[in-house]
Design a protein with these regions (language model features):
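Canonical Radical SAM [4Fe-4S] cluster-binding loop centered on the CxxxCxxC motif
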Residues: 1-35
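Radical SAM enzyme [4Fe-4S]-AdoMet core and its adjacent flexible, acidic
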Residues: 6, 26-27, 31, 45, ...
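Conserved SAM/AdoMet-binding glycine-rich loop
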Residues: 13, 23, 36-112
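Short, flexible helix/strand-to-coil boundary loops that buttress conserved ligand/catalytic motifs
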Residues: 19-22, 92, 118-119
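Residue-level recognition of beta-strand->loop/alpha-helix junctions
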Residues: 19-22, 55, 83, 156, ...
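Short linear capping/connector segments at secondary-structure termini
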Residues: 21, 53-54, 225-228
Length: 240
C-alpha cells in the first residue's frame, strides 16, 4: 500500500507542460509540521509501506518536508520524491537523501536557455537551471560518497515543440551521472487545454532512438515508448 501526495500546493515553477498552468487560481497552503508527523503515524498504523511526494505542489517548499521524510524513515515507510530541485539546497539534501528511496528531478531541457523558457519565465532566466544542476550534482556526489542506495533520475516531459532538446537532455543526464534520464509524453485533457499535437510524436522516433543510444554503464536513457506511441488514444472506457 502506497500513498501519492504533496506537502504543499505551492510551486515556484511555471512549466508549460503542467496542467496547473491552465487551472483557476487556487489556495496554495502547506500542511503544518505537527499535522504532517501525525499523518505519518496514521500511515504506519494502517500499514502504508510507501509515500511518493509528487504532483499537486513542490513539496520541498514545505516547512514539513525534512521532518516528514525523517519521521517516515523512523516508521519504516519508504519515501520517493519528484522535485524541480530549485529549493533542494545542500542542507535539505544532507538531511533527507539518506532516507529516500528515489528522487526524480523534473528537467525540461538540456540547455539552460530552453530549460528556463519552458519551466520559468524566459530564456534569460538561466539562474534556475544553474541552481537546479548544482543541487542535483551535489545529490549525485553525496550518494556516491555515502554509498546510498537511493535511485536518482531526471525526467523530461516531451511536447513536440521541445524536440530540439531531446539529445541535449540525454547528454545532460549522462554528464550528471544520474541513474536514469527518462523521456515521457505530455498528457493533455480531453479538451486539449495544453495544445499537445500527438500526431507530431512519430516524427521524433529516430531522435528518441538516438537519445537512448547515449546510455552508458552509469546512466540509462529511457524513452516511455508505450505512451508516446499511444498518443491521445484512451485505453479505458470511463474515468471516475
Amino acid at each position: 500500500i502506497s500513498v501519492d501526495m504533496a506537502l504543499t500546493r505551492s510551486c515556484g515553477a511555471m512549466c508549460k507542460f503542467c496542467y496547473a498552468m491552465v487551472q483557476e487560481p487556487q489556495e496554495r497552503s502547506a500542511i503544518r509540521i505537527k499535522d504532517a508527523l501525525n499523518l505519518v503515524d496514521d500511515f504506519a498504523e494502517i500499514g502504508v509501506k510507501g509515500v511518493s511526494l509528487i504532483s499537486d505542489g513542490e513539496s520541498t517548499l514545505s516547512p514539513a518536508y525534512a521532518p516528514f521524510i525523517e519521521h517516515c524513515a523512523s516508521a519504516n515507510i519508504d519515501v520517493g520524491n519528484a522535485t524541480n530541485a530549485w529549493d533542494w539546497d545542500k542542507e535539505k539534501i544532507e538531511r533527507v537523501l539518506p532516507h529516500l528511496t528515489w528522487v526524480r528531478f523534473t528537467v525540461a531541457a538540456g540547455s539552460p536557455g530552453r530549460y528556463a523558457e519552458i519551466m520559468y519565465k524566459s530564456k534569460d532566466d538561466t539562474h534556475v537551471f544553474d541552481n537546479a544542476m548544482k543541487n542535483i550534482k551535489y545529490a549525485v556526489e553525496l550518494k556516491k560518497r555515502l554509498g546510498l542506495k537511493v535511485t536518482l533520475g531526471i525526467q523530461m516531459v516531451l511536447m513536440p515543440e521541445f524536440r530540439d532538446e531531446i539529445i541535449p537532455f540525454a547528454k545532460l543526464g549522462v554528464d550528471l551521472g544520474v541513474d536514469y534520464a527518462v523521456i515521457k509524453h505530455c498528457s493533455d485533457d480531453t479538451e486539449g487545454s495544453l495544445g499537445v499535437d500527438y500526431s507530431k510524436y512519430e516524427e521524433m522516433f529516430d531522435t528518441l532512438l538516438d537519445a537512448e543510444s547515449l546510455s552508458n554503464e552509469t546512466t540509462k536513457v529511457i524513452v516511455k515508448w508505450s505512451k508516446i506511441e499511444e498518443g491521445n488514444d484512451c485505453t479505458y472506457n470511463a474515468m471516475y
